[in-house]
Amino acid sequence: MPSNICKFFLTWWLIQQVTGLTGPLMLDTAPNAFDDQYEGCVNKMEEKAPLLLQEDFNMNAKLKVAWEEAKKRWNNIKPSRSYPKGFNDFHGTALVAYTGSIAVDFNRAVREFKENPGQFHYKAFHYYLTRALQLLSNGDCHSVYRGTKTRFHYTGAGSVRFGQFTSSSLSKKVAQSQEFFSDHGTLFIIKTCLGVYIKEFSFRPDQEEVLIPGYEVYQKVRTQGYNEIFLDSPKRKKSNYNCLYSSAGARESCVSLFLVVLPSLLVQLLCLAEP
């Protein structure tokens, strides 16, 4: 009997790790995502992030290459751009880098953070990008479009969020272009009040991009036809993590990471307890 129980829980845990990797994606609150807003620890993170960035470079060659490319572009466009007090070269470089080739790999790591937090090598990049949007946000709301080649399914109950940083466009034509959308995908029509218009920072200004932080929550969700989803009433923010990589958040970090690995630990302990 203990052996059967062990097998059951091991199978259950493995299923949890792969659920959602195939077929339509669930539109929910993205519980596995890394969604830190760094509330109360910005000064600490500004001190620590440069060191974290070097650590990330050592473990993530793609990020290092993308960062160096973005840094060159940022230095070229910086003199002709306006930005608020507190916005520095790190913030600008991160924002430019996101519009390049790194976004797909970065967002995958953000979405799957809870499954493997030890392999998250975008610590500083996540902070700088989050902070860039916070500094550039002026409270304006935008009506935007996002086309995907992946089908999303909404159960019809509850608020939702993307969890990851989400690119959208002021242009429906851009969102529905073959580069981003297919007949088997989903077209999102979104009202965002935390998203920031980043055309002036982008490698692709023709995309008319509005970048939405993953912690924006939409309280009204409506589906239309086969592949359109409307997201409205973005009045709340939700994060499961805060100041995870700052010394100010050391206690919270331990608790959060313990909760992340708890299911696998329970499975292993159960198996070891067999006679």
From Swiss-Prot:
Catalytic residue positions: 146, 167, 209
Signal peptide bounds: 1-20
The TR mART core domain, residue ranges: 61-238
Gene Ontology molecular function terms on file: hydrolase activity, acting on glycosyl bonds; NAD+ nucleosidase activity; NAD+ poly-ADP-ribosyltransferase activity; NAD+-protein-arginine ADP-ribosyltransferase activity; nucleotidyltransferase activity
InterPro entries per the UniProt record, alphabetical: ADP-ribosyltransferase_ARG, ART
Residues modified to ADP-ribosylarginine: 204
Removed propeptide positions: 247-275
Catalysed reaction equations from the record: L-arginyl-[protein] + NAD(+) = N(omega)-(ADP-D-ribosyl)-L-arginyl-[protein] + nicotinamide + H(+); NAD(+) + H2O = ADP-D-ribose + nicotinamide + H(+)
GO cellular component: plasma membrane; side of membrane
Annotated residues for binding of NAD(+): 98, 146, 164, 202
Membrane topology reported for the UniProt record: Lipid-anchor; GPI-anchor
Residues with a covalently attached lipid (GPI-anchor amidated serine): 246
Keywords of this entry: ADP-ribosylation, Cell membrane, Disulfide bond, Glycoprotein, Glycosyltransferase, GPI-anchor, Hydrolase, Lipoprotein, Membrane, NAD, NADP, Nucleotidyltransferase, Signal, Transferase
Annotated PROSITE patterns: ART (PS01291), TR_MART (PS51996)
TM region positions: none
Location of the protein in the cell: Cell membrane
Pfam families referenced in this protein's UniProt entry, alphabetically: ART
Known tissue expression: Postthymic T-cells.
Cysteine pairings via disulfide bonds: 41-243, 141-193
E.C. number(s) listed in UniProt: 2.4.2.31, 3.2.2.5
Family: Belongs to the Arg-specific ADP-ribosyltransferase family.
Job of this protein: Has both NAD(+) glycohydrolase and ADP-ribosyltransferase activity (to a lesser extent).
Protein name as it appears in the record: T-cell ecto-ADP-ribosyltransferase 2
Classification of source organism: Eukaryota, Metazoa, Chordata, Craniata, Vertebrata
Gene name tied to this protein: Art2b
